[in-house]
C-alpha cells in the first residue's frame, strides 16, 4: 500500500485529490497539509466523511512526513510554496507529484536539483489530464506537417487563476517549438504588431471556466483547430493519483505524464 500525503488539502484541487485517494485500492492517505484548518479532519473538505487524518500545519512538513512514513507527496499549490516544500520532501526521501503551475525556470532548476541530489522520483506536469496529454501529442504531430502555417494558442480559465498564460498553454507552445526546431513566443498583441514566424499565446480569464485550450494552425485558405475542454477538475485529480501510483515503481528520476501514460 502506497502512503500518500497531500499539500493544500483544503483547497479545490487538494480536496479532490484526497477524494480520489480514498477510491484507490493501492494507496492510502497518511498526511494532509495546509496553512489553515489545522487539526480538522481532511475528509471534511473532501466530503468523504471522517478519515482520521488531521490537517497538519505545512510548517511541520518534514516532521509529519517522517512520522507517517509517506511514500509520495502530491502538490498542487503555488509556486512560492512548492519551491520551499518540494526540496523538504525530497530531503525526507519522499517522491513527488507536482502539478503547480507558474513555476519559473529558475525555481524548477532548484526543485530538480533537490530531486536528483536525494535520489527520489518525481512527476512534474502542468496538466495531469489524460486528454490534454493526448492533445499535446496530436499538436506535436500536426506541427510537423503545418510548419509554414501561422500558429496561435488561446487558453481560457476561471477568474481566480493566478498565473497567465497557463502552464498547459506554455507546454503546448514548447511542444510545437520542439517539433519545429525553436520558435519565438509572443504574448498577446497590442498596437502596431506585424506578425512574424512566432507562436502567439493568448489568455482569457472569466467566470468558472475549468480550462479550455485551442491551438490554431492558420493558412491562407484553411484553418486547423485542435481543442481541448476540461469540464471538471476531477480529470486533474484522477491523473495525479494515477501518476502517484505509477511513480513509486520507477527508478529515481524526473518524469512527465508522457511517461506515466506511455505516450
Swiss-Prot record:
Compartments in which it is found: Cytoplasm
CDD domains, per the entry? DHDPR_N (cd02274)
Molecular-function annotations in GO: 4-hydroxy-tetrahydrodipicolinate reductase; NAD binding; NADP binding; oxidoreductase activity, acting on CH or CH2 groups, NAD or NADP as acceptor
Carries keyword Oxidoreductase?
A: yes
Q: What class of enzyme is it?
A: oxidoreductase
Broad class of the protein's primary localization: cytoplasm
Give the binding site residues for (S)-2,3,4,5-tetrahydrodipicolinate: 158, 167-168
Instruction: Check the record and name the SUPFAM superfamilies matching this protein.
Output: Glyceraldehyde-3-phosphate dehydrogenase-like, C-terminal domain (SSF55347), NAD(P)-binding Rossmann-fold domains (SSF51735)
Record function comment: Catalyzes the conversion of 4-hydroxy-tetrahydrodipicolinate (HTPA) to tetrahydrodipicolinate.
Name of the featured protein:
4-hydroxy-tetrahydrodipicolinate reductase
